[in-house]
Amino acid sequence: MEKYIGLIARVFLGSLYFVSILFILQFILNAPQGYEAYQVNLMSKGLPGIFAPISILVQLVFGIFLILGFKIKLTSYVFAIYSLIWALTYFMFMGNIPTEVSPSVYQDLLLKGLQYLSLFGGFLYMAAHPQMALSLDNVCANRKKKK
């Protein structure tokens, strides 16, 4: 059972990003000017508009990679950087909120930032220990050994 813990963690972490981007893509495709609205949403948090296609690409492609266990080390580093960017974005966004806003808004942003910092740490750990059960990386490595 212990060897499958990495698999479970990998699938759940990958699913977090993959399912999230599916909902975002559904919004983009179904809403009038959905992509522009997504860009504006990101820019309202202080991220440049170019982050929209990068975010879609990272979550979609690397989410699938992580679920399948393909290039686990690289994928983990990509998601670690992505998570750190989001954590810092939420922390910096806290400073741009007027003081008359409810304290719960600050708490919400703080918690989101801390959640992304936790993901950052988890992805760094996964990058340090990329050997996991039932991954495409292991299948490829076993085929190379047989040749």
Model-derived regions: residue spans:
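Cytosolic, membrane-interface loops and tails of multi-pass inner-membrane proteins
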Residues: Y35-L42
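Generic signal for short, ordered secondary-structure residues
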Residues: V40, G63-I64
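Extended, low-polarity transmembrane helix blocks
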Residues: M1-Q33, G46-L57, V61, L68-K147
